[in-house]
Swiss-Prot record:
Coiled coil: none annotated. It is an enzyme of class 2 (transferase). PROSITE patterns: PCMT. The gene is pcm. GO terms for molecular function: protein-L-isoaspartate (D-aspartate) O-methyltransferase activity. Belongs to the methyltransferase superfamily. L-isoaspartyl/D-aspartyl protein methyltransferase family. GO terms for biological process: methylation; protein modification process; protein repair. This is Protein-L-isoaspartate O-methyltransferase. It is found in: Cytoplasm. Its main location: cytoplasm. HAMAP family: PIMT. One of its GO terms (cellular component) is cytoplasm. Its EC number is 2.1.1.77.
Length: 212
């Protein structure tokens, strides 16, 4: 079921769970999540749960998409955001409506190709895609004043820290694959990096190397 009432119930739940950024909530309200999942799962698209998208990947839980987006924007608007892990393209689509430009890296080409098609369908034109190793980021276009990582790393990749602009913010899950991990907010400051642990999460692992 993809009715407006179903979407409104999801927005109400996100608000009750602590998402308070009105712009984030509005973007999630108007973005058709059912386009980002297989047709067989479309009836579950507005449940607050992660869903499989193939290739051992998932579309993230709406709360997590909202929460990570809100954290990224906590200090104000951003004009240049790097996304590690395009996946279904849902988080990408949300970001594209919240920031000026999104640069999205995905290692699984078939997923990225589908995500591109969905964003074109939604007329979101401010996203540039790269097929490659997310652990390496996208150094040629660095620095970024926001980085969002949608897969868990055992530790924060140094390459991503290096690509964060002064004052920039990174939201990333850190910890062992298949176990409870910690969501972290990292801010690049004059004397280094501040790190804030935001709570337990579970994400698929951030893997090396592109995959056709």
């Amino acid at each position: 079921m993809t009715s407006q009432r179903t979407r409104e119930r999801l927005i109400q739940r996100l608000y009750e769970e602590g998402v308070s950024n009105a712009k984030v909530l509005e973007v999630i309200r108007k973005t058709p999540r059912h386009l980002f999942v297989d047709e067989a799962l479309a009836h579950r698209a507005y449940e607050d749960t992660a869903l499989p998208i193939g290739h051992n990947q998932t579309i993230s839980q709406p709360f997590m998409v909202a929460h990570m987006s809100e954290l990224l924007l906590e200090a104000g608007p951003l004009d240049k955001v790097l996304e590690i892990g395009t996946g279904s393209g849902y988080q990408t689509a949300i970001l594209a409506q919240l920031v000026e430009r999104v640069f999205s890296v995905e290692r699984i080409k078939v997923l990225q190709d589908r995500a591109k098609e969905r964003l074109v369908e939604l007329n979101l034109r401010n996203v540039v895609f790269r097929w490659g190793d997310g652990c390496e980021g996208w150094p040629a276009l660095a620095p970024y004043n926001g980085i969002i990582v949608t897969a868990v790393a055992p530790e924060v990749p140094q390459a991503l820290l290096d690509q964060l602009a002064p004052g920039g913010r990174m939201v990333i899950p850190v910890g062992p694959a298949g176990e409870t991990q910690q969501l972290m907010l990292i801010v690049r400051e004059e004397q280094g990096f501040s790190r804030r642990v935001l709570g337990a999460v579970r994400f698929v692992p951030l893997l090396n190397g592109p995959l056709a």
